[in-house]
Amino acid sequence: MPKMKTKSGAKKRFRVRPGGTVKRGQAFKRHILTKKTTKNKRHLRGAVTVHETNMGHMAQMLPGQGI
């Protein structure tokens, strides 16, 4: 059986934490920021974790990562 391949787009966008959770960046932060309030942009800072309902998809895209 051949090796399972990691989705190259997923490995650039997600990081697996030691506890098995997956870290991701926030969306809606790249452009068209002038119409967004400062408070809205502030809340989009930093990274968040992938929701547990999407962890099955993460495990398929990132095999061998201990998810």
From Swiss-Prot:
InterPro entries: Ribosomal_bL35, Ribosomal_bL35-like, Ribosomal_bL35_CS, Ribosomal_bL35_sf
Name of a matching Pfam family: Ribosomal_L35p
One annotated Gene Ontology cellular component of this protein: cytosolic large ribosomal subunit
UniProt region (Disordered), positions on chain: 1-25
GO terms of molecular function: structural constituent of ribosome
Record GO biological process: translation
PROSITE patterns recorded: RIBOSOMAL_L35
UniProt superkingdom: Bacteria
Keyword Ribonucleoprotein tagged: yes
Family indicated by similarity: Belongs to the bacterial ribosomal protein bL35 family.
Name of protein: Large ribosomal subunit protein bL35
Organism from which the protein derives: Polaromonas sp. (strain JS666 / ATCC BAA-500)
